[in-house]
A protein has these predicted regions:
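Conserved helicase/translocase P-loop NTPase motor core
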Residues: 101-107, 339-392, 405-406, 563-586
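Conserved motor-region signature of P-loop NTPase helicases/translocases
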Residues: 1-69, 122, 128-130, 138, ...
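Conserved ATP-dependent motor core of P-loop NTPases, especially the RecA-like helicase ATPase domain
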Residues: 6, 19-21, 58-62, 72-269, ...
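Core structural elements
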Residues: 95-108, 160-184, 339-345, 360-373, ...
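N-terminal accessory segments
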Residues: 1-30, 34-39, 260-380, 417, ...
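Cytochrome P450 core scaffold surrounding the K-helix E-X-X-R motif
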Residues: 118, 820-830
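Conserved ATP-driven helicase/translocase motor core recognized via long
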Residues: 53, 172-360, 457-458, 564-565, ...
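Conserved catalytic motifs of ABC-family nucleotide-binding domains
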Residues: 826-867
Length: 993
């Protein structure tokens, strides 16, 4: 019999409290899902609430399914205890139609049930993401062609401003970027118009630029630099004052300090600060004769650094007075209004085309639902009031990842005091999906704890006990984040109130469970022979060319060394039978492969390298990175065949098919065919060559052409998916690829192609020609499709995955690898920056004068977005460290020069501050800063190892040489695991033709 759960006092509050809006701040591993399920059960059992009177909104479909299963299991348990309770039995039936779903599913339900309230067909369908992207490109082409033909003057000016007539792609990308961004706002067109109107100043009425939100941010930035400079100079001035021989140097440096203090005192007003900075003259430091130089030389170094930092910041900000700043912004108003018009034109045509195809995307569904639930004045409609009556409570899981549209929708159907929100703002890591952690934070600051709550207050509950991890994991995580996460950088003060507190009951396994940090130092000097370089991966939320933020090109050679080290670390854990605690068996056991995860910030570049090195040691591993599905051999082979079935005159696909396993022609045979007629199309040559080639080749050609002709006839009456599956059977190609290396994966990829074809038959890409065109457009849009996944969660393999994909998971041993990878801040250099409050940041562009530079509004937004991006990176690091149950291992590459520079910076400051933290370029930088400032505490919680790249290479070279059987062993292990699992993903009945 299972033990009864012992809920903490805080968990009990989250389960039983009611009659107000409730925000549950649930730290990592605090059992929030279990609490939410128990709250639902309590509503059903004790409060006699039927399950269909609850709306439970989850972040993913998988989470919704898990929630349903847990609730059903709990209901059955209660039925076992009370078999005569008919009401409980009825809940099982009601659960089938209960609203436990994602926000997308709920909105879809609202729209389908109320389609008559808006201008939409009852039979609309949800479009495939790729289909939407292709349609967007088609609409842009149509729109631009129309504008070119009509010689639209506004359009011509936009082309001049953003493309210079060389290529209109940048303008198209700009339109799509802004269009997609504004869809996360409840009223997209209104938001865009309001933010553009922020540029519509009356110059005569303008106040000091410091009165704008942009000016406040920029002056705050300068103040931080000036404050920091004063902190650094004061000790140097004091040292010089104590040395009689350095009187002249003292007076000179004192004068510099006075100027900084004067600027500091006037940073509340833009024009004062601008005027003072413009007249500042720090002079040239002359040498004192016959004096000791140590104090002066050090003071000179500090001064140069301070003035250099001030110059690099102020020269980008205090470059114009208020009038000039406003004038720059006003000058961009006209072009932005023209851009707005083009975006609205695109939006209207795009909406029209979707309507013609009777399709919508999920963004449409949300906005349709909003239109149904809120009237023009933002008040709940009669339909919304019906939903208010329908639901006794609205529970929102992962609330930190909500956006503003979802907030409006769920608030509109609430009674005003019946929303239960659970989440952890420290795990808000979906900024690129327009998640708004500020929604959580605003409630976190205003809702009251129970002891402080009055009748009209909303309630805040904190779940701070962690039931996932050992004390060693929690203590290390708490140390790191208590030193780096603040409201200024991190958007939350990580005080003791936020600490992860031990809740798990682990037994001693006799292992050293201190966090292990392994830094691999790499030489700064370039090798005589240039190593192979890898382009830096650009995620959808990344972009920067500014020297201050430039991401270094990652070198494949260096990543390989770190991957070697990680592979050996995993082998040591397995070979040494590292002990982990089995909570179910309540005893320790040997570690398994599946107990280990390698987490990477991004997987596209690094994951294949780590996978390769781990496989070399005979370790079964599964990498969850996106591979190039459309470039895989099996997909290219079938796509080439489909192309010639559609049109055999296409030479490249024809020759490729003939050379493939399906065609079976040798290179010599193809040359023989070509030589029979060098000038005609290859297909025509093939038809004519039958009389000019050997009998054996003639028979081969006849058989090939007959097969192609048969498929061409069959395509006229078979559906596309039926044709593809028939090709698999006719050629035996499906079975053939199953015998190749990674055969199960290749077969699963072919099944995915079949499924994709089946989907296209039901949408606007029906038929062979349209399907080929659909796939080609995916390629030209630089998109791809993920390869099939055929490894289950219980398979005994080491996993490599991104930190984002690990969210919600847990592993006994977490290896956070590539922690020295620099943050990608490239979005900060886009031509236009978009911010929910600060609006639009643009470059000042004068096409006629060939002048372009960032407006101050853009600089302010860039500054704000950098802080927000670093804050999100901090939260991503929090997610990574809190996946570990028993041990954390952190590895990363670092240049020795950079480590020395960090040590120099640390010596300048008495404590770790935001200036140092905001200059960090990687997770390893933050961890290193904590180590340097809190070395004694860190040493009690972590082992700090500095390794040389060359030593690791030697270590790996002196171990047992790589053997082919090691590779084969890893592959064999994977094949055994994968056996028959492709069929688990796809129902075989689907493929019966």
């Amino acid at each position: 019999m299972a033990e009864e759960v012992k809920w903490t006092d805080e968990q009990k509050q989250a389960i039983y409290e009611k009659d107000s809006n409730i925000l549950v701040a649930a730290a990592a591993g605090s059992g929030k899902t279990a609490v939410l399920v128990e709250r639902i059960i309590n509503k059903i059992i004790n409060e006699k609430t039927d399950i269909d009177r609850l709306l439970v909104v989850t972040f993913t479909n998988a989470a919704a399914s898990e929630m349903r299963e847990r609730v059903l299991k709990a209901i059955y348990k209660k039925i076992d205890e009370n078999p005569e309770d008919e009401r409980l039995q009825r809940q099982v039936t009601l659960l089938n139609k209960a609203s436990i779903c994602t926000i997308d599913s709920f909105c879809l339900d609202v729209v389908r049930n109320n389609f008559f309230e808006i201008d939409i067909s009852q039979n609309f369908r949800i479009a495939d993401t790729t289909e939407i992207e292709i349609l967007q490109q088609d609409v842009l082409e149509e729109l631009f062609e129309e504008k070119y033909e009509s010689k639209d003057e506004n359009f011509a000016k936009l082309i001049n401003t953003y493309t210079g007539y060389r290529d209109d792609t940048p303008l198209k990308e700009l339109i799509l970027t802004i269009y997609k961004y504004i869809q996360s706002n409840p009223y997209p067109e209104k938001w865009l118009d309001e933010k553009i109107e922020m540029f519509n100043f009356n110059l005569e009425e303008c106040k000091d630029f410091s009165q704008t939100s942009w000016g406040k941010i920029l002056l705050k930035q300068i103040k931080e630099v000036v404050d920091d400079g004063i902190i650094q100079l004061k000790p140097e001035v004091q040292k010089l004052s104590e040395c009689d021989d350095l009187k002249k140097s003292y007076e000179f440096l004192r004068g510099n300090l006075n100027q900084l203090e004067l600027l500091q005192a006037n940073l509340d007003t833009w024009d004062k600060a601008y005027t003072i900075y413009a007249t500042m003259d720090f002079g040239k430091w002359t040498m004192d004769r016959n004096v000791k130089l140590d104090e002066k030389v050090n003071a000179q170094k500090v001064r140069e650094k301070v003035l250099s930092t001030l110059k690099s910041s102020a020269e980008k900000v205090l470059i114009m007075d208020s009038n000039e700043a406003y004038q720059d912004i006003i000058n961009m108003y006209d072009i932005l209004k023209k851009l707005e018009g083009l975006i609205l034109d695109f939006s209207q045509i795009f909406a029209k085309r979707k309507k013609e195809k009777n399709m919508v995307d999920f963004s449409d569904v949300e906005h349709f639902a909003l239109k149904i639930l809120l009237d023009e004045n933002g008040n709940p409609t009669e339909i919304a009031k019906k939903y208010q009556s329908k639901f006794d409570e609205i529970a929102i899981d992962e609330y930190q990842d909500s956006n503003l549209v979802q907030e409006y929708i769920l608030t509109s159907i609430s009674k005003g005091n019946n929303i239960f929100m659970v989440g952890d703002v420290k795990q808000s890591i979906y900024k690129f999906r327009q998640a708004r952690p500020d929604l959580f934070l605003s409630k976190y600051k205003t809702y009251k704890l129970k002891q402080d709550k009055t009748e009209n207050d909303d309630l805040k509950i904190q779940l701070f006990k962690n039931f996932r991890s050992r004390k060693e994991v929690l203590d290390f995580s708490n140390l790191i984040f208590s030193k780096i996460m603040t409201e200024e950088l991190g958007e939350l003060n990580y005080t003791e109130e936020e600490y992860l507190n031990l809740g798990a009951d682990y037994k001693d396994t006799g292992e050293d469970l201190k966090t292990e940090i392994d830094i691999i130092t790499i030489d700064n000097k370039e090798d005589e022979e240039e190593p192979e370089e890898l382009e830096v991966e650009v995620d959808e939320n990344e972009d920067t060319q500014d020297e201050e933020f430039k991401t270094e090109v990652e070198r494949k050679e260096d990543i390989e060394v770190e991957a070697m080290f990680v592979a050996n670390k995993i082998k040591q854990l397995i070979d040494n039978k590292f002990q982990v605690y089995d909570a179910k068996a309540k005893e320790k056991r040997d570690i398994k492969y599946k107990d280990i995860v390698v987490l990477l910030r991004s997987t596209k570049i690094s994951a294949p390298i780590f996978e390769k090195e781990i496989i070399k040691l005979g370790i079964p591993v599964f990498s969850d990175s996106s591979s190039e599905y459309l470039e895989s051999l099996e997909i290219q082979t079938i796509m080439n065949l489909l192309k010639i079935i559609d049109n055999p005159l296409q030479e490249i696909p024809l020759v490729a098919t003939m050379r493939s396993t399906i065609g079976g022609f040798t290179d010599n045979e193809l040359v023989e065919i070509r030589l029979s007629d060098k000038y005609d199309n290859f297909y025509n040559t093939l038809l004519k060559s039958k009389k000019d080639v050997s009998e054996q080749l003639r028979n081969k050609i006849n058989k090939f052409l007959e097969q192609i002709e048969m498929w061409r006839k069959e395509q006229e009456y078979l559906s596309l998916d039926e044709l593809i599956w028939k090709i698999y059977n006719d050629t035996g190609y499906f079975n053939y690829v199953g015998l190749m290396r990674n055969g199960e994966l290749r077969q699963a990829n072919l099944k995915m192609l079949f499924e994709r074809a089946k989907q296209c038959e039901s949408i606007s890409f029906k038929g062979l020609y349209n399907f080929i065109n659909y796939i080609e457009k995916i390629k030209t849009s630089s998109k791809d499709m993920d390869s099939a996944k055929i490894i289950g969660e219980n398979d005994d393999v080491v996993r490599i995955m991104s930190i984002h994909k690990s969210k919600g998971l847990e592993f006994p041993v977490v290896i956070l690898a590539n922690s020295g990878k620099q943050f990608n801040l490239q979005d900060l250099n886009s031509k236009i920056l978009l911010h929910p409050e600060l609006g639009i940041g643009v470059k000042y562009i004068d096409y006629d004068m060939q002048i372009t530079y960032d407006t101050l509004s853009k600089r302010a937004i860039k500054n704000k977005m950098k802080i927000e991006t670093l804050s999100e990176e901090m939260r991503v690091l929090y997610v990574a460290l809190t996946r570990a149950k028993e041990k954390i291992i952190i590895t990363g590459l670092a240049k020795k020069e950079k480590q020395d520079k960090m040590l120099e910076n640390v010596e300048k400051y008495d404590e770790l501050n935001i200036m140092l933290l905001s200059k960090a370029k990687s997770y390893l930088d933050w961890i290193t800063l904590v180590h340097l400032y809190y070395e004694r505490t860190m040493e009690s919680l972590a082992t700090w190892n500095v390794l040389q790249k060359e030593d690791i290479i030697k270590m790996c070279a002196t171990q047992e040489p790589e053997k082919e059987e090691n590779k084969n062993m890893a592959q064999k292990n994977l094949l055994l695991l994968k056996h028959k699992k492709a069929d688990r993903i796809f129902n075989d009945q689907l493929f019966t033709v």
